[in-house]
């Protein structure tokens, strides 16, 4: 558990959580549900620690880039259009863990990331095509989903991530009334 006080003051300048009063004690499920800045700042800080209490910006950024690479965020998706090269944050380590770094991702790169989360680790080569047909309607080529990589982590961890994401949908009213089951 991590105790969100509302202000992450392990770095200078301090970083405020969106909920200024603090969320209190959080596990990862609740941190995802509440999108707690403090929680994810602490993860970035802890992953950058060397020794007892010394923080290494470089180590923290290296860890972020390592994990981003596992889920395919450091490479193009493979879609049949020109695509910008993704960039995983290389500055401001701690705020980067809550998405406030200098990341650069296209919509398709973020869609692939969401698919990795939803499929418990399948990193797909994306395609916009289902099939190509000639003028007579005959299929020339069909495109099947292609798994480029698999993130091998415990199913328990995927369950925790999925539960946290499900809680986002079930807890917040912005998703009410859509007429479809979202999660």
Question: Residue ranges of each PLM-predicted region?
Answer:
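Beta-lactam-recognizing serine transpeptidase/beta-lactamase-like catalytic domain environment
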Residues: 1-183
């Amino acid at each position: 558990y991590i105790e969100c006080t509302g202000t992450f003051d392990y770095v200078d300048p301090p970083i405020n959580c969106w909920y200024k009063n603090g969320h209190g004690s959080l596990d990862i499920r609740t941190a995802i549900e509440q999108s707690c800045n403090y929680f994810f700042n602490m993860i970035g800080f802890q992953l950058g620690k060397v020794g007892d209490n010394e923080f290494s910006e470089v180590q923290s950024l290296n860890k972020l880039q390592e994990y981003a690479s596992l889920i395919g965020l450091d490479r193009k998706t493979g879609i049949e259009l020109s695509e910008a090269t993704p960039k995983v944050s290389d500055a401001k380590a701690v705020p980067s863990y809550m998405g406030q770094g200098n990341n650069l991702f296209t919509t398709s790169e973020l869609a692939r990331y969401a698919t990795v989360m939803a499929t418990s680790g399948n990193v797909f080569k994306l395609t916009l095509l289902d099939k190509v047909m000639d003028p007579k309607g005959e299929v020339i080529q069909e495109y099947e989903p292609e798994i480029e990589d698999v993130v091998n982590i415990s199913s328990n961890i995927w369950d925790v991530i999925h539960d946290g994401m499900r809680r986002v949908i079930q807890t917040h009213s912005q998703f009410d009334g859509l007429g479809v089951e979202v999660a």
